[in-house]
């Protein structure tokens, strides 16, 4: 999409004409957490800035049908959605912070999850190995997060609700962390791609919020194949 979504968002919000706009594309379902990481970098360079992060996907624009099982699953699974958050370098009372960002790239598995062009349309490639691939990548990132020194323990995992089999594989890999919020989002909204993990975060916060006794751990994954994670906790 050119110009990007940020151009239209800035116009509708009436932002000043010299506001810095940046569109991150090509990251698929995993994009929300890298966007938060980009916001962290902007705030580090400009401590007085206010950053709006928007994750928006119109999966219905890539609707395609044939008899391939991956295509059929994609047509049943994916949906449209958007989520947004506002960030500052200094949180207010009762605020939260994202930190401890990490990423894992697995380019050897790039072709297991991607778009291709077919008859002038976007056709989703969804390999049956994706659930186990996601679980393996998430396990590696979580191991690295657990090894970090001087951080709070992880009390809850908020995962991208990529599908039933994906969530089953994640819970099998990390059985101490049930993914109830992610399952509710999948049930109610389907897989909205990048906004989904933020929907799961909002859903989890209906049950409670992280505090000084422990962080939540957000994780998403998608095209590349790549996985991304960060800690979310009380400031």
Regions found by a protein language model. Give the residues of each.
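Phosphate-binding/catalytic loop of phosphoryl-transfer enzymes
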Residues: 44-54, 59-72, 224-226
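Short beta-strand segments
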Residues: 25, 50-57, 79, 87, ...
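Short coil/turn connectors at secondary-structure junctions
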Residues: 17-19, 45-51, 72-73, 81-82, ...
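Short glycine-enriched loops at secondary-structure junctions
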Residues: 7, 103-107, 164
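Acidic-glycine-rich active-site phosphate/pyrophosphate-binding loop
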Residues: 1-15, 54-64, 111-113, 167-178
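Claisen-condensing/thiolase-fold acyl-transfer catalytic domains that form or cleave C-C bonds
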Residues: 11, 18, 23-44, 135, ...
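Condensing-enzyme catalytic core mediating Claisen C-C bond formation in acyl metabolism
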Residues: 63-136, 140-143, 221, 233-235
């Amino acid at each position: 999409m050119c110009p990007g979504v940020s151009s239209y968002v800035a116009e509708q919000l009436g932002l000043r004409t010299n506001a810095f706009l940046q569109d991150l594309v090509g990251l698929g379902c995993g994009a929300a957490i890298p966007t938060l990481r980009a916001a962290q970098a902007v705030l580090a360079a400009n401590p007085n800035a206010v950053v709006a992060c928007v994750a928006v996907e119109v999966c219905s624009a890539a609707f395609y049908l044939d008899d391939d099982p991956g295509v059929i699953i994609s047509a049943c699974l994916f949906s449209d959605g958007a989520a947004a958050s506002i960030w500052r370098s200094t949180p207010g009372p009762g605020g939260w912070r994202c930190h401890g960002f990490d990423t894992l790239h697995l380019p050897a598995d790039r072709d297991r999850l991607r778009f291709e062009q077919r008859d002038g349309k976007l056709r989703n490639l969804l390999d049956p190995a994706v659930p186990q691939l996601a679980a393996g990548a998430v396990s590696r990132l979580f191991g690295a997060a657990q090894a970090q020194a001087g951080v709070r323990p992880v009390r809850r995992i908020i995962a991208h609700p990529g599908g039933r089999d994906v969530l089953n594989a994640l819970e099998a890999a990390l059985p101490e962390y049930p993914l109830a919020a992610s399952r509710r989002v999948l049930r109610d909204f389907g897989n909205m791609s990048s906004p989904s993990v933020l929907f799961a975060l909002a859903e989890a916060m209906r049950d409670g919020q992280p505090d000084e006794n422990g962080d939540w751990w957000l994780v998403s994954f998608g095209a590349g194949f790549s996985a991304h994670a960060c800690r979310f906790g009380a400031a």
